[in-house]
Swiss-Prot record:
Protein EC: 3.1.1.29
UniProt cross-references to Pfam families, sorted A to Z: Pept_tRNA_hydro
Matches recorded under NCBIfam families: pth
Protein name: Peptidyl-tRNA hydrolase
Family: Belongs to the PTH family.
InterPro entries in UniProt: Pept_tRNA_hydro, Pept_tRNA_hydro_CS, Pept_tRNA_hydro_sf
Purpose of the protein: Hydrolyzes ribosome-free peptidyl-tRNAs (with 1 or more amino acids incorporated), which drop off the ribosome during protein synthesis, or as a result of ribosome stalling.
BP terms from Gene Ontology: protein quality control for misfolded or incompletely synthesized proteins; rescue of stalled ribosome
């Protein structure tokens, strides 16, 4: 079996550790813990790393298409490797959730998230496993675009690092148990 773990974000130093890139942050943490490095794949339009866990190949993916076109990379990888939607896990930011909160879901709408909207359009379904990490709503009249492309303030950054650790735990639990429903029961709350 093979699993595709995709963190959403925007490529480039300009977007490093911005709110919209918490998916990349989590994928980077998983790569670091597994001691694997990313290589850029032009065909898939993604940075890829892989490792084996309990005989299962795990791909860590950071699309390099920019957020709004993330579905291109996801669809290409699913198709090339002949994977089912059940083999996919998407990790991304959610501005409708409090900073640092996490929520695991097996389906749902895009909720205004353009990366998720792109994935739904490209793979043809809204039924896929996902982990949402809260980044909070904009404050003091700040636009949504400015909010998601800005860095976390100090206190929020500490909370985000803690939530990334919790998501890391949940993803590892999911990979061990091979049961997303059980993972949701354990980590949602």
């Amino acid at each position: 079996m093979t699993k595709l773990l995709v963190g959403l974000g925007n490529p480039g130093d300009k977007y490093f550790e911005t709110k919209h890139n918490v998916g990349f942050m989590l994928i980077d943490q998983l790569a670091k813990k597994q001691n694997v490095t990313f290589t850029h794949d032009k065909i898939f339009q993604a940075d890829l790393a892989s490792f084996f866990l309990n005989g299962e190949k795990i791909y860590l993916v950071k699309p390099t298409t920019f957020m709004n076109e993330s579905g291109k990379a996801v669809h290409a990888l699913l198709t090339y490797y002949g994977l089912d939607i059940d083999d996919l896990l998407i990790i991304y930011d959610d501005l409708d959730m409090e900073v640092g909160k996490i929520r695991l879901r097996a389906k749902g709408s895009a909720g205004g998230h353009n990366g998720i909207k792109s994935i739904i359009q490209h793979i043809g379904t809204h039924v896929f496993n996902r982990v949402k990490i809260g980044i909070g709503r904009p404050k003091n009249g700040m636009s949504v675009v400015h909010h998601v492309l800005s860095k976390f303030d100090r206190d929020d950054y500490i909370g985000i690092l803690q939530s990334v650790d919790k998501v890391d735990d949940s993803v590892n639990y999911y990979l061990q148990e091979k049961n997303f429903e059980k993972t949701m029961q354990r980590y949602n709350g």
